[in-house]
Amino acid sequence: MAKLTKRQKAIAEKIEAGKSYNFEEAATLLASLPAAKFVESFDVAVNLGVDPRKSDQVVRSATVLPHGTGKTVRVAVFTQGPAAEAALAAGADRVGMDELAAEMKGGDLNYDVVIASPDAMRVVGQLGQILGPRGLMPNPKVGTVTPDVATAVKNAKAGQVRYRTDKNGIIHTSVGKIGFDAVKLKENVEALIADLKRIKPASSKGIYVKRVTLSTTMGPGLVIDQSSLDA
């Protein structure tokens, strides 16, 4: 059995196994743990009462967190004409069509979000094998294929998160950075859960939000007492 590092031992001493934590208590405790050598994110995992093997129970959406994620988001937009001007005015880092596709084929993929207007999908369709595995392929279900590219850019820059249930029916997403105020972090999580409830599949039975776990990038996951959340 591998020995625990000094950091892991310090963390283990502060965590109470089997406990469900009040949200603010969990956020404060995680922020107080020995830090990694970079600014960690707060991440949340939500176990949902769905069967992701059934297509009508795959939960997938996007929502703008009220306080963002603390991350600088680079956005590329496939569009042309007046929409291209609107995307640039909204803060897009790169806007184009065939020339942008050529750049991406050449390996320039330093973007966090890729957005496309419907008329640009003839170009974007060539990039499926490049963008798909990286989770960057535009999709109307999460608002990244839209005629209103300017609003999509603003949402991405404002801290919109995209999520989809994994094979175990769990969604994972970042909800802030270590320096976030606990109240703002809580409001971000509440907004996420409210959005999950909004798109609950009609065929989902029983308890829908089964468990909420808060963690930091390199830290442990703490189960949250859902009664401490207003969602």
Curated annotation (Swiss-Prot):
InterPro entries reported for this sequence: Ribosom_uL1_bac-type, Ribosomal_uL1, Ribosomal_uL1-like, Ribosomal_uL1/biogenesis, Ribosomal_uL1_3-a/b-sand, Ribosomal_uL1_CS
Pfam families: Ribosomal_L1
Regions crossing the membrane: none
GO term, biological process aspect, one: regulation of translation
Source domain of life: Bacteria
The entry's keywords: Repressor, Ribonucleoprotein, Ribosomal protein, RNA-binding, rRNA-binding, Translation regulation, tRNA-binding
A GO-annotated cellular component: cytosolic large ribosomal subunit
Molecular function terms, GO-annotated: rRNA binding; structural constituent of ribosome; tRNA binding
Keyword rRNA-binding on entry: yes
PANTHER family named among the record's database cross-references: 54S RIBOSOMAL PROTEIN L1, MITOCHONDRIAL, LARGE RIBOSOMAL SUBUNIT PROTEIN UL1M
Similarity section: Belongs to the universal ribosomal protein uL1 family.
Subunit relationships: Part of the 50S ribosomal subunit.
NCBIfam families referenced in this protein's UniProt entry, alphabetically: rplA_bact
Physiological role: Binds directly to 23S rRNA. The L1 stalk is quite mobile in the ribosome, and is involved in E site tRNA release. Protein L1 is also a translational repressor protein, it controls the translation of the L11 operon by binding to its mRNA.
Name of this chain's protein: Large ribosomal subunit protein uL1
Source lineage: Bacteria, Pseudomonadati, Pseudomonadota, Gammaproteobacteria, Pseudomonadales
